Swiss-Prot record:
Its main location: membrane. It comes from Xenopus laevis (African clawed frog). GO terms for cellular component: endomembrane system; membrane. Disulfide bonds: none annotated. Residues 394-415 have a biased composition (Basic and acidic residues). Residues 394-417 are annotated as: Disordered. May play a role in the trafficking of a subset of G-protein coupled receptors. The lineage of its organism: Eukaryota, Metazoa, Chordata, Craniata, Vertebrata. Belongs to the ODR-4 family. This is Protein odr-4 homolog.
Length: 446
């Protein structure tokens, strides 16, 4: 028996809107959440059109052969940065006219493996034994509205397609929010002060991998209580909530406790490592994870919030270095503010997506970016700025005041690029949560 996908009705409405475009073929991503019992699809986003898509077409290629899997994969990478913990790219969809339906499955197979590879390329965490390895492909005939849903095991390159059920839901899917502020203080040694940005980014990733192990081993308290990893998040489930067609948003607060080596009787050793410079990431990260409210498990909530922390650290560092490679730093001895995280609600749901902003960007820039990448219109008053801009200070003031409360900003002006530069969405802004800023600093040893 194949997997079953419970699909929010907004997805069906979105497909109806795409049909009206009357295009020969449209590709896009399916976003949602896997679980051991059910899979949930909550959102879909079509692939942005390349500006040069109508130029320099190779002769003899069909519409399906013109689909650029690399472009679709780049879109998946950008979408991945906008997903909080618990949500992920479940797979891909392809809408075609009847005459192109015959070869649709071949294209979908190619796309689903390419998208998965791109989505996981730079992630700090790895899948565990509880993760679902199947990804979904969906073909929609724009004329007959017929849907063909299949899954592939992304751990097996020779995987054969399996049939799956695609079930639209009339009621609103209910979600539980796991909310957390995590103080981060990570120092990463660099072997040489003359490293290129690419080499420095690689060194930082290696340093973050070691820190990732600490996060994965940490204990998470939910609403101040320790709960068994394999148990239910709530001891009692309200029977009335199952039959209700309306969701009531629930928020659980999480707290991280670092594991002590004395607890598990492991020996702690000091590591001596020569270095010419170091990089420090300090501040408080605002993290959120979402899990479906149908008998939520402790391990699911723990996984969602931990992966959100790891993802947002990695994404912000990548965005900062992308910006440095494009524009160059004003002074590498200064603290560089990491991007500001902004949460964006999904209409009709208590789910939220996220995005990152430069210091000189406005909410209009964020709205344009969301429309381009997620194909979603966002109202300005709906934006959730849980991380606020901090006041900048001069270098001499930082000597007498806590470094984590003041940052040095970069003077370059930046604007969002067009869809042809999806991978160059550098986003840099000073951020603060509870008066504590997120900074990244370089220190050089003479």
């Amino acid at each position: 028996m194949g997997r079953s996908y419970y699909v929010d009705d907004r997805v069906e409405k979105y497909f109806s809107k795409l049909v009206q475009q009357q295009k020969a073929c449209i590709t896009g991503l399916i976003i949602g959440q896997y679980s051991s019992q059910r899979d949930y699809a909550v959102l879909t986003a079509q692939t942005p059109q390349k500006e040069d898509q109508n130029e320099e077409k190779k002769p003899g290629l069909s519409k399906l052969e013109e689909i650029d899997d690399e472009w679709v994969s780049m879109h998946a990478s950008q979408v991945g940065r906008m997903l909080p913990g618990g949500l992920m790219v479940l797979g891909v969809f392809l809408m075609t006219t009847p005459d192109l339906s015959k070869d649709a499955q071949t294209i979908l197979r190619k796309l689903v493996f390419a998208v998965e590879k791109s989505s996981m390329k730079n992630r700090l965490w790895n899948f565990d034994e509880d993760d679902v390895s199947e990804r979904v492909t969906l073909h929609i005939c724009s004329s007959t509205k017929k849907i063909t849903c299949r899954t592939y095991d992304i751990n097996d390159p020779k995987s054969t397609p399996k049939p799956a059920d695609w079930k639209y839901q009339n009621s609103v899917l209910s979600w539980l929010t796991v909310d957390c502020n995590v103080r981060v203080d990570v120092t990463i040694p660099l072997t040489s002060p003359s490293l290129t940005y690419q080499e420095r980014q690689k060194s930082i990733r290696l340093g973050l991998v070691k820190w990732t192990k600490e996060i994965e081993d940490s204990v998470v308290l939910f609403n101040g209580q320790y709960k068994d990893k394999n148990g239910d998040l709530f001891e009692e489930q309200k029977k009335s909530s199952r039959s209700s067609s309306h969701y009531s948003p629930q928020i659980i607060t999480a707290n991280f406790l670092n594991a002590s080596p004395l607890i598990d009787n492991t020996r702690s050793t000091a590591l001596v490592q020569p270095c010419k410079s170091s990089l420090t990431i300090q501040g408080v990260m605002k993290c959120r994870g979402f899990i479906h409210s149908n008998r939520p498990k402790v391990k699911d909530a723990m996984q969602a919030i931990k992966r959100d922390l790891l993802n947002t650290i990695q994404d912000r560092c990548e965005l900062l270095f992308e910006d440095m490679m494009l524009n160059g730093p004003s002074n590498e001895n200064d603290a560089c503010p990491l991007p500001q995280r902004v949460f964006v609600p999904i209409n009709g749901s208590n789910l939220k997506l996220c995005d990152y902003l430069f210091g000189d960007e406005t909410t209009s820039d964020l709205q344009s970016h969301f429309l381009e990448i997620m194909d979603q219109e966002v109202e300005q008053n709906e934006l959730d700025f849980t991380e606020k801009k901090c006041e900048l200070a001069h270098p001499e003031k930082r000597e007498s005041e806590p470094a984590s409360q003041h940052l040095e900003s970069k003077p370059e002006n930046k604007a969002r690029s067009s869809s042809t530069s999806l991978l160059n969405k550098g986003l840099v802004i000073s951020t603060i949560v509870a008066s504590i800023a997120i900074i990244i600093s370089f220190y050089y040893i003479m």
